[in-house]
Amino acid sequence: MGRVTFIGAGPGSADLITLRGAKLLAQAQVVLFDALTDPALREYAPLARWVDVGKRGFGHATSQPAINALLVHEAQLSEHVVRLKGGDPSVLGRLEEELQALATHGIAYDVVPGVTAALAAAAHTARPLTRRGHGRSVSLTTAMTQLGVLQATRTADTEVFYMAGRQLGALASKLMQAGWPADTAALVVSRAGWPDARVSEHEVGQLADAETLHAGRPAVVTVGAGAMPAVQTGDKPSPDDPRP
């Protein structure tokens, strides 16, 4: 019986993985990886067997029960299995179900955190998610329910919505229904954490204007305090400028 390590690969480029994550990935015999992880991560574990268990929105996807079963199967055959997840395993990553599957079969596990897309978007645009005095709370929300219904909330000073890129116009309507004024600041970042990240600034009422720019790209939408510029001077760098 082996051990499973869940590793957050970060939301984009391979160098966003943590040092601990890279070290443990290098020790893997088998790697079950998500669709949005950087192929360059294979360089950390070139001798491991890599198994694609990715989910792709509106395309081919490995079912969650199939992933759970495969994870258990591989852990029963190998000493060290890595479950490589995009972003952070604990944020909208179905981690609970996979942990439960392992626990049911008495398989040991540990979890290594990673950078989630909301944080990568905040870093890329230099827009902190929390602000002193007017941005004291943050909510990370999937815009799609388990039944595929679009939802929006107003429960925090900054709301970050995942998986909303295909329905920005509808999200705008839901946000205003939830109590966000139409002129509230909103920020859309697609492929956050990658060199080709795209950024657009809007008011909530005009979010539909971003659909063409971000079409076909995984995007996060930040609304409220964390969407506003942190620097108000006219010489601040563009959000699209390369950043280390």
Language-model features: locations:
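Short hydrophobic/aromatic-enriched beta-strand-loop microsegments
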Residues: R49-K55, G106-D110, L129-G135, P181-V188
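Short hydrophobic alpha-helical segments that form membrane-spanning helices or hydrophobic packing faces
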Residues: L19, A120-H124, L171-A172
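Class I SAM-dependent methyltransferase SAM-binding "motif I" and its flanking Rossmann-like core
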Residues: D88-A156, R198-E201
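Class I S-adenosyl-L-methionine
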Residues: M1-V112, Q206-A219
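Short, well-ordered alpha-helical microsegments
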Residues: D38-L41, A118, G148, L168-G169
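A contiguous loop/helix-start segment that scaffolds small-molecule binding in enzyme catalytic cores
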Residues: G2-V4, Q76-V81, R94, S137, ...
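Short, acidic/turn-prone active-site loops that include or flank metal/cofactor-
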Residues: P11, L36-D38, G54-A61, V115-A117, ...
